[in-house]
Amino acid sequence: MYNGILPVYKERGLTSHDVVFKLRKILKTKKIGHTGTLDPEVAGVLPVCIGNATRVSDYVMDMGKAYEATVSIGRSTTTEDQTGDTLEMKGVHSANFNNDDIDRLLESFKGIIEQIPPMYSSVKVNGKKLYEYARNNETVERPKRKVNIKDIGRISELDFKENECHFKIRVICGKGTYIRTLATDIGVKLGFPAHMSKLTRIESGGFVLKDSLTLEQIKELHEQDSLQNKLFPLEYGLKGLPSIKIKDSHIKKRILNGQKFNKNEFDNKIKDQIVFIDDDSEKVLAIYMVHPTKESEIKPKKVFN
């Protein structure tokens, strides 16, 4: 039985569910879950939690992501990416903008921004996914969502050809960010229709491309009984949370029994959630949270016996 976090390289054409389904067959275990959907046409890092690590999948999802995308100015599509039908076209030429214009524009997207999710997305409105409305040619008001663009920058020269302009960007962002919507919004600010023509996720939850394995590589390692060495411990998925190392055996026992604590029993300031780590084994004991009605207390959220 495997336990840990496995960074998978999801190839284009597969859904995130496809990856989990195939892994369950390869590893012969049902206790597998991914840490956030990647669209079928997007390649890149998809951390997968296996065994007891499935309990920390939400925390891996919260740790942020990084992408490399190609923005195409001059044509917009129904899906905001290269898979959709053309909505609008407007010829773009090198006289319209240059590298400096794009760099200044990208700076304006840094920080907390508002996005309207694309119609072809899994965001739910009135209990129904937006892509279900889109497939039925129904329109529905899409709620604006705040997302965090931690960093964004151009990583290629502008390529003007066939009345369009293409350039690559690198984006570091929080969860829930739609890069294809970012591409179309860049176009709006330039005064042109636009779409995202290619996307690769280069980092997710602290895992990067060089750590990621294809399904074929995973199958080979499993058959050679050497896959466990490639898995990251579940503690890795909690590195986005503050932690306290526990030495006292009595305190360890209380934590593992799920007892409440007063905040002032610990030297560290506890603002929201805290991870307790066994000082001897370096293993996680539990995740605690501030009590919802008693601010001076913390209570267990997840205990790892």
Swiss-Prot record:
What keywords does the record list, in alphabetical order?
Isomerase, tRNA processing
| Keyword Isomerase found | yes
InterPro entries xref list = PsdUridine_synth_cat_dom_sf (IPR020103), PsdUridine_synth_N (IPR002501), tRNA_psdUridine_synth_TruB (IPR014780), TruB_C (IPR032819)
UniProt-recorded Gene Ontology molecular function terms: RNA binding; tRNA pseudouridine(55) synthase activity
Which EC class is the enzyme in? isomerase
Q: What catalytic activity is recorded? A: uridine(55) in tRNA = pseudouridine(55) in tRNA
Name-wise, this protein is tRNA pseudouridine synthase B
The organism is Staphylococcus aureus (strain MRSA252)
Q: Which gene encodes it?
A: truB
